[in-house]
């Protein structure tokens, strides 16, 4: 179980053991977008609405490093025809943006710090792949895909933390989908 890659299902297991309101109907909606032009999904809700729980649920469902069949037994997603097709079929990269924004030494070069952390772990997880020197994240993903056929499922939690944590850098007002790329470019 890695920090970013294939974290397993323990976090969702802990959630389900408590009083859990079944929100697994999100899974078939995401499944329907796999291998389509609409494969990039953004779940937006107000704060404290359960987005982090949903992210952990998606990690548990897609992560190939664990078996989550029993964890989802009796939940809504299990009834969907696509359930078995995608269950535990991907290497999942989970990124909680607040784990970076909370570290003052990383705030100046946030995107680079995120890439460096993920790249380091990916190279550890796939040591037999040949990588170009000074590879960025896209180069590393491409090298792994071409070397192994491995496909990745990215889950980015607290992506809007960039807008909350850097209000002084917001040049645009409005939707975080518009603001975040501008802040990331700085």
Regions found by a protein language model. Name each.
Residues 1-186:
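Phosphate-binding site recognition
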């Amino acid at each position: 179980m890695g920090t970013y890659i294939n974290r397993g299902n323990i976090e969702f297991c802990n959630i389900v053991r408590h009083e859990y309101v079944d929100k697994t109907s999100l899974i078939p909606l995401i499944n329907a977008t796999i291998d389509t032009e609409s494969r990039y999904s953004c779940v937006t809700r107000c704060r404290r609405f359960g987005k982090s729980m949903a992210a952990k649920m998606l990690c548990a469902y897609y992560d190939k490093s664990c078996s989550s069949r029993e964890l989802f037994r009796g939940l809504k997603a299990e009834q969907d025809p696509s359930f078995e097709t995608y269950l535990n079929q991907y290497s999942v990269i989970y990124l909680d943006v607040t784990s970076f924004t909370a570290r003052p030494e990383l705030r100046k070069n946030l995107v680079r710090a995120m890439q460096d952390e993920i790249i380091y772990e990916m190279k550890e997880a796939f040591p037999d792949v040949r990588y170009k020197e000074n590879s960025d994240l896209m180069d590393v993903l491409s090298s792994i895909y071409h070397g192994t056929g491995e496909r990745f499922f990215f889950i980015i939690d607290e992506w809007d933390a960039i807008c909350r944590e850097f209000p002084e850098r917001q040049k645009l007002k409005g939707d975080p989908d518009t603001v975040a790329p501008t802040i990331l470019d700085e």
